[in-house]
Amino acid sequence: KFLPKIIKIKKNIDSDFLKKINNKYFDTDGNKENLKFILEVAKILKLKKNSLLRTLKKFKGLKYRQEIIFQSKKLTIINDSKATTFSSSVSLLKSLTNVHWIVGGQAKKGDKFLLSKKNCKNIKAYVFGTKRKFFTSKLKKLMEYESFLDLKSLIKKLLREIKSKKNIRHTTILFSPSAASFDNFKNFEERGKYFNKLIKKYINA
């Protein structure tokens, strides 16, 4: 039987333990926070460190929630279709460098993008969908952007663009729409599945 208890979470994770985990899923600020909580609970439950380490190494998270769907030396592709507001995308954007951010969908009324211009210098936005004017109006003074009618034409152009560049530093394609999916999809799962399908089709085209 477990009684209610307030758990004090450590500010920092042991860097050596983090290296041993060697899982890109825990590289983002949000998932590092989740990992801190996991480690504290593991201590209370007296879980064996080696067993915990094996599990964390293999952990992939839930589908369409900061899901790494492709990784190479030069490119990482993350499917974060679950992100339906600007705030749900910001923490991930702050954690990454050299980001091609795919954004668009049914915008939430009154939604604000609270990221400073300084934190946007390594981000380029690729805006898609019928509501793209809403997104470009919010982002145009903060970062470079391109606008597309649909997700398919965006993916084809973006992948061609990345492949054509030689000697570029590591790049991340982040699909974090910051909007509801109802303009073109039944839900965020269908949207995430469609994104994965497009990447699979055009990544080696």
Place the predicted regions along the sequence by residue.
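Phosphate-binding loop of NTP-binding sites
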Residues: 1-2, 155-157, 193-205
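Short, hydrophobic beta-strand segments that form beta-sheet elements in well-ordered domains
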Residues: 1-11, 101, 124-130
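Flexible active-site lid/hinge loop adjacent to a nucleotide/diphosphate
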Residues: 1-8, 15, 19-22, 183-189
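Nucleotide phosphate-binding/pyrophosphate-handling subdomain across enzymes
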Residues: 24-122
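C-terminal helical cap/extension that packs against the catalytic core
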Residues: 29, 110-170
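A structural signal for short, well-ordered beta-strand elements
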Residues: 45, 144-147, 184
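Short active-site-adjacent structural elements
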Residues: 86, 110-111, 134-136, 181-185
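Short beta-strands and strand-loop turn motifs
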Residues: 173-178
